[in-house]
Amino acid sequence: MSDGPIAPPKPAVVAEAHEVDTFHVPKAFFDKHPSGPHLKNLDEYKKLYEESIRSPDVFWARKARELLTFDKDFQTTRIGSLENGDVAWFPEGRLNASFNCVDRHAIKNPNKVAIIYEADEPNEGRTITYGELLREVSRVAWVLKQRGVKKGDTVAIYLPMIPEAIIAFLACSRIGAVHSVVFAGFSSDSLRDRVLDAGSKVVITTDEGKRGGKVIGTKRIVDEGLKQCPDVSTVLVYKRTGAEVPWTEGRDIWWHEEVEKYPAYIAPDSVNSEDPLFLLYTSGSTGKPKGVMHTTAGYLLGAAMTGKYVFDIHDDDRYFCGGDVGWITGHTYVVYAPLLLGCSTVVFESTPAYPDFSRYWDVIEKHKVTQFYVAPTALRLLKRAGDHHIHHKMEHLRVLGSVGEPIAAEVWKWYFEKVGKEEAHICDTYWQTETGSNVITPLAGVTPTKPGSASLPFFGIEPAIIDPVSGEEISGNDVEGVLAFKQPWPSMARTVWGAHKRYMDTYLNVYKGYYFTGDGAGRDHEGYYWIRGRVDDVVNVSGHRLSTAEIEAALIEHPMVAEAAVVGIADELTGQAVNAFVSLKEGNETNDQVRKDLILQVRKSIGPFAAPKAVFVVDDLPKTRSGKIMRRILRKILSGEEDSLGDISTLSDPSVVERIIATVHASRGK
C-alpha cells in the first residue's frame, strides 16, 4: 500500500542539457585527417586531465619542455598561490617568445608559409614565409632598439589586421619589450588613456586602415590621442594606403624607410619566464580600463597547449581565426598559438560581409583552411544572410571553433550542418582575456559535444560552482552558481598593470583561494559546463566586453546629462546590446537630437562598437534610499519582465518605475 502521493520528479537545474542531443566526433573528421588527432580518445583526455589536477607540477613541467624552447631550463614548476596573488611559473627559466614563434621554424623550413594575409579587397593579399618573417621582425626590432626601446618598456600598437601587426608583436618580444595593443576601433580618447596608463613612449600605427570597403583614419586618430601624451617620442607609421597624413617631424617615422637601414637579423634577447610579454586593456566594472598583464613562459605554454589539443593543430595546417589582434582572441589564436606550433595563420583584414556574405567561405576554400575560429555574432549574421552564400565544399575543414560568448543551439547546428557539412568537429570555447587561453572547451577529435555547452575543463583547470549568497562551493552535478577556478594555471594573468590591489579585488579576493571569473555557470548531470554570462556590470557585445561604468562616464560627460545607467539586454545579432537610461539636467528638453548626440558622445569617447542601441530619456532613475541605481530593474523592464520586478518599495521613489515603463513602451511604439 502506498504511503501517499508520489512527489513529481524534481526539474533539472541545468534544464537545457536535457533538450539537446550529444554529438560525437564525426567519422569524416578522422577520414580527412592527415595523421590523426594528438589524443587517441576521451579516456586519454581523462587520464591526462587527472594528472594535471593531481600532479600539476609534473604535468606542466613536462609539457613546457615539450612545447617551448628554453635558453635556460627551470628547476621549479610553480611557486605562489591564488590566495596571495603571487603565482609564478618556471621561475628560473629563460626564453624568448619571438624565437619560439619564428626562429625555430625558420631554421628548419624557411620557405614554409607563416602568414596568409587576406586583404580587405579580395586577391590583394600575400603570403609571408617563416624565413621572411624572421627578417622582417628583426628589422623592426632594430628600429625599436635604435629609438631607445629597452627591455621592459611598453610599446603601444594601434594597427588594423595586417601582417605588420604580427611583426610588431614579435619585434617587441624579440628585444624584451612589452607590447600593449589598442584595438584599432577605439577612439582617440581611449587610445590616449591606454598610452598614458602603460607609459608607452613609442606608438606603432598606419597611415590609414581598410575594413569592409571603408577607410579608417588611424594616423589621424593617433595624432588626436597623443596631444595629451607628451612622453611619446616615436610614432612608427606603416604605409597601408599611401594617403597624405599629418606629420610631426622628429616624432613620426615611416616604417618602410626605417627598416631599410638595418640588418635582416638581430639576436633574440633572453628574458625570464615571468617577465611581462604584453598588456591588454579590458573593461572593468569600475569604468577605468585595466591593463591585464601576461608573462612570457606561462602564456606561451597556454597558447601552444590549447592550439595543439583544442584545435588539433599540426604543422601543415592552415589556421583561420577571425578575431582581431586588438583583443585576446587575436593575440592567442591569430598570433601566438599558430606560430608557436609552426603552422600557417590567416590574417583577415576585412569583414564577413565584404564584398558579400560568402567572404569567409571564399577564404576557407581558397587557402584550404583546416581550422576556423570565430564569434557567434558573425555566425548569426551569416545564418541570417542565407545558406545560398555557402557554395564551397570547404573539404579541408576539420575544426570549427566558436569564441566570445555562448553559442545558441540553433546556430551551433547550422554551423555544424551547413558550414561543416557534418564533417567538422565544433569546439565552443570558454575563456577570458585574464585566462590567456581556452579554459573550458571540447578537444577536437576527442570530446562529445552538446550544442550550447562549453563542455569540459582544459588541462589544469579545476572549476568550482559557488553559491553567490553563502560563498560556499556547491558540489555534485546539476548545479548552478558563479564560476570560479580552484588552481592556478600557467597562462593566467599575473596582475593589472600598476594596480595589483585591483587585480586582487577583482579576481582573487571575491572568494578567497579561488579565481573568480565574473560569469555565472551551470554544471549539468554529466559534468558538462554551461556558461550563463556576466554577473557583474559588464556587457558582452559581439564578443567584446564593455564596462557599463565606462559607457555611463562617457554619457555623463555630456553637458545636458545629470545621471546615466547602462545595461545590456539580449540581442539576436550581437548577443547583447547596450541600452542607456539618462536623466537630463533641469531646463533641458527631450528630443531625438539629444539621443543622437548622446550616441555620438559614446562613439567619440570609447568607440563605435560601444554606442548604445537605444537611449531612453527619463525624469529619474530607480535608486535605493542610499542612492544606488538598481540596474536590475531596468534590465527586467527592457526584457518585458515587468511583472517580476520584485519588491520596489525599498526604492527612494517607487513611482519612477511606472514612468520608466511608460517611456520604454512609448519608444517601442507599444
From Swiss-Prot:
Enzyme Commission identifier(s): 6.2.1.1
GO biological process, one term: acetyl-CoA biosynthetic process
Induction comment: By acetate.
Residues that hold CoA according to the record: R211, G212, G213, K214, T329, S542, R603
InterPro entries found in the cross-reference section: Ac_CoA_lig, ACAS_N, AMP-bd_C, AMP-bd_C_sf, AMP-binding_CS, AMP-dep_synth/lig_dom, ANL_N_sf
Residue positions binding ATP: G404, E405, P406, D428, T429, Y430, W431, Q432, T433, D519, R534, R545
Top-tier EC class: ligase
One Gene Ontology MF term: acetate-CoA ligase activity
Keyword Translocase belongs to the record: no
SUPFAM superfamilies in the cross-refs: Acetyl-CoA synthetase-like
A single Gene Ontology CC term: nucleus
Catalysed reactions, semicolon-separated: acetate + ATP + CoA = acetyl-CoA + AMP + diphosphate
Keywords per UniProt: ATP-binding, Ligase, Nucleotide-binding
Superkingdom as given in the UniProt entry: Eukaryota
Family: Belongs to the ATP-dependent AMP-binding enzyme family.
UniProt protein name: Acetyl-coenzyme A synthetase
Species per Swiss-Prot/TrEMBL record: Emericella nidulans (strain FGSC A4 / ATCC 38163 / CBS 112.46 / NRRL 194 / M139)
Lineage, uppermost ranks: Eukaryota, Fungi, Dikarya, Ascomycota, Pezizomycotina
